[in-house]
Amino acid sequence: MKTNFHTHTYRCGHAVGTERDYVAAAAQAGCELLGMSDHTPWPVPGVGMQAGELGDYVAELKQLRGEYAGKLELKIGLECEYWAENMNWLRDQIAEHGIDYIIMGSHFGNVRGERAYFGAVTDRDGLRSYLDHTVAGLETGMYSYLAHPELCLRAYPQWDKAAEDTCRQLARACRDLNVPVEYNLEGLRANRKGNHPGLGYPYRRFWDIAAEEGCIAAIGYDAHMPETLLDDTDFEMARRLIENELGMKRIETIF
């Protein structure tokens, strides 16, 4: 692993370890460029840091950036949802805190007029809502890549025309907008453990389509434990799949 841009901390409420723990693990693993990207503290309820934590998160990472200068390059990022009514707020936070980048994690949106988790959708309406919501977010031009692009397949029960159409339209949008798609290693670990109730993600047919449509790929550890960064087995498997089997262009860095 030379680079990783999908890294969480305890602040999001569903990961363990401090910023220092992850940076130390990355340095031990020989990482050259690490991006920290914990979940944004939105002004609406959801998964993410608590309100007021963003300043501490950034301050700690700036301290670590100085400590590890010459050993590891550290970028300060966030994994962000897309909430149309709050994007000006997000732009202000990025400017105020000097955030280097954001990646899109499209977890939540509206399905049939109600807020829903896209990783739990099981019907065509859910797939369509995920597609429309995610593409609208990407069209803002704010996101450096799309994390776990096929999250909508996590609980979806079968590969059918609706699933294929959704994946193809999403892949085409990412290609046309020049937004890389992430092969998500946290999802891969969950697949292995049987933790996805449906097709799951990463899902091979999505990646076949992404290759056919000319998407650019990234690999993200989506680390929720520092020790995840110490094992490159899944990274190497993903790299071989993307580069050798699928013949896709893979980026090492978003900078």
Question: Which residue stretches match the model-derived regions?
Answer:
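Aromatic- and acidic-residue-enriched segments that line the glycan-binding/catalytic groove
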Residues: 91-94, 99, 196
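Charged catalytic cores and adjacent phosphate/nucleic-acid-binding surfaces used
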Residues: 1-9, 19, 142, 153-154, ...
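Non-catalytic positions within long, well-ordered alpha-helices that form the structural scaffold/packing
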Residues: 27, 95, 138-139, 211
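Short loop/turn motifs at secondary-structure junctions
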Residues: 30-32, 98, 142-145, 247-250
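Short glycine-enriched, charge-decorated loop/helix-capping segments at active-site entrances
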Residues: 47-51, 117-122, 196-197
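An N-terminally biased module of ancient metal coordination in phosphate/nucleic-acid-related enzymes
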Residues: 1-84, 89, 96, 159-170, ...
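Divalent metal-binding pocket/active-site signature
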Residues: 16, 42, 101-193
